[in-house]
C-alpha cells in the first residue's frame, strides 16, 4: 500500500514533469521541418545539371522544390515572354529542363525531395490547365502559382483581375489542384482609399484562390506582413523566405520588373538582414502557411547562400 508521503512525492514528480513534456512538444512544434527552395535561386545550376543539383540540394538538407515556368506544355505567350527576357538574365532553362514530369519525379524521389508547387504564367493557367494539372499530379504538386500579374489602372481593373483569378481557381479545383497568387509586391498602394491586393483577397472565394507571400517584396511594397498574415488567416499557404540587407522600398508601385531589379542588391540570406523573421514566421505558422520556401533570386554564391539560409531556418525556434 502506498504511503501518504510516497503518494505526495509521486504526485509532485508527475506534476513537475508535465511542463517539461509540454515544452518538449512546443519546441518540436516551433521548428520549421521541411524547408523548400525556389529553383529561380539557382537557375544556371539546374540548367547545367538538373540531377546533380537535386542531389546537392538534398545533401545540404532541403526537402522541397518549387519549379518555375514556362514548361513544354505552357501557352505560347508565356514562352514568348520568357524568350524575350532570358537574354538579359544569362540563362534560358526553365520548367523541367528538358526532362519529362515522370523523369523529374524519379530524380526527386531518389533524393528524398518533393515538389509542392509549380510557378507558371497567366496564359498557361487560362489555356493549359489540363496539362499543367497533369504534370502537377505526376509530381505530387498541390499548388500552381502565378508569380506576378499586370498592374491595373484603377479599382475596376483590379475587380476584373480578381474575378479572373476566381475563375482560374475554380478551374484548378476541377482539375484537382489549387491556384495561388504571388503578387510580387504589386497592388499594395491604395487607390481611392482601397488597397488593390486587399480587394483581390476579399473579392475571391477562399476555396478558389490562395496566396504565396514573399516577405521581401511585400515589405518593399510598404505593408506590414504580420498584419496581413493575422488578418487573412488560411489564405496564405506558401511563403518565400529571404531577408533584406537594409529597409528599402520600391521606387514606384512595385508592379514593374525594373523596380524589382533595382532592389536585388538588397536581397540577403535568411537571418542576415533587418527583417524580424522569428516574428514573421511565427505568425505565418499560425496563419496557416504550409510551405516555407527559401528564395534568393539569382543567388550570387549559390551553394554558400543556400546553406546559410537553410542553417538559419533549421535552427530557428518560433514563439507561441
Regions found by a protein language model. Give the residues of each.
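C-terminal/domain-terminus segments
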Residues: 292-315
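Alpha-helical scaffolding segments of alpha/beta enzyme cores, especially the outer helices
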Residues: 52, 56, 99-106, 130-138, ...
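Active-site acidic/histidine proton-transfer and metal-coordination neighborhood
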Residues: 11-13, 18-19, 94, 111-210, ...
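A short, acidic, amphipathic alpha-helical segment used as a generic capping/interface helix at domain edges
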Residues: 272-285
Amino acid at each position: 500500500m502506498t504511503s501518504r508521503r510516497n503518494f505526495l512525492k509521486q504526485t509532485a514528480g508527475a506534476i513537475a514533469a508535465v511542463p517539461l513534456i509540454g515544452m518538449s512538444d512546443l519546441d518540436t512544434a516551433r521548428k520549421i521541418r521541411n524547408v523548400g527552395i525556389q529553383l529561380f535561386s539557382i537557375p544556371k545550376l539546374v540548367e547545367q545539371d538538373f540531377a546533380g543539383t537535386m542531389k546537392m540540394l538534398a545533401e545540404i538538407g532541403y526537402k522541397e522544390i518549387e519549379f518555375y515556368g514556362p514548361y513544354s506544355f505552357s501557352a505560347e505567350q508565356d514562352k514568348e515572354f520568357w524568350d524575350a527576357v532570358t537574354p538579359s538574365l544569362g540563362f534560358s532553362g526553365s520548367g523541367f529542363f528538358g526532362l519529362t514530369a515522370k523523369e523529374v519525379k524519379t530524380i526527386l524521389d531518389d533524393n528524398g525531395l518533393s515538389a509542392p508547387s509549380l510557378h507558371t504564367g497567366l496564359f498557361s493557367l487560362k489555356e493549359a490547365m489540363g496539362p499543367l494539372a497533369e504534370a502537377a499530379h505526376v509530381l505530387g504538386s498541390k499548388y500552381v502559382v502565378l508569380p506576378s500579374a499586370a498592374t491595373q489602372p484603377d479599382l475596376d481593373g483590379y475587380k476584373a483581375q480578381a474575378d479572373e483569378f476566381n475563375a482560374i481557381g475554380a478551374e484548378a479545383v476541377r482539375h484537382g489542384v489549387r491556384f495561388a497568387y504571388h503578387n510580387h509586391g504589386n497592388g499594395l498602394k491604395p487607390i481611392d482609399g482601397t488597397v488593390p491586393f486587399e480587394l483581390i483577397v476579399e473579392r475571391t472565394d477562399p476555396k478558389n484562390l490562395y496566396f504565396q507571400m514573399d516577405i521581401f517584396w511585400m515589405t518593399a511594397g510598404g505593408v506590414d506582413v504580420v498584419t496581413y498574415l493575422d488578418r487573412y488567416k488560411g489564405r496564405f499557404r506558401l511563403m518565400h523566405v529571404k531577408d533584406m540587407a537594409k529597409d528599402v522600398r520600391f521606387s514606384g508601385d512595385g508592379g514593374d520588373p525594373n523596380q524589382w531589379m533595382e532592389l536585388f542588391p538588397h536581397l540577403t540570406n535568411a537571418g542576415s538582414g533587418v527583417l524580424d523573421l522569428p516574428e514573421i514566421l511565427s505568425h505565418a505558422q499560425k496563419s496557416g502557411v504550409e510551405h516555407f520556401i527559401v528564395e534568393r533570386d539569382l543567388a550570387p554564391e549559390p551553394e554558400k547562400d543556400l546553406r546559410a539560409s537553410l542553417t538559419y531556418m533549421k535552427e530557428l525556434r518560433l514563439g507561441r
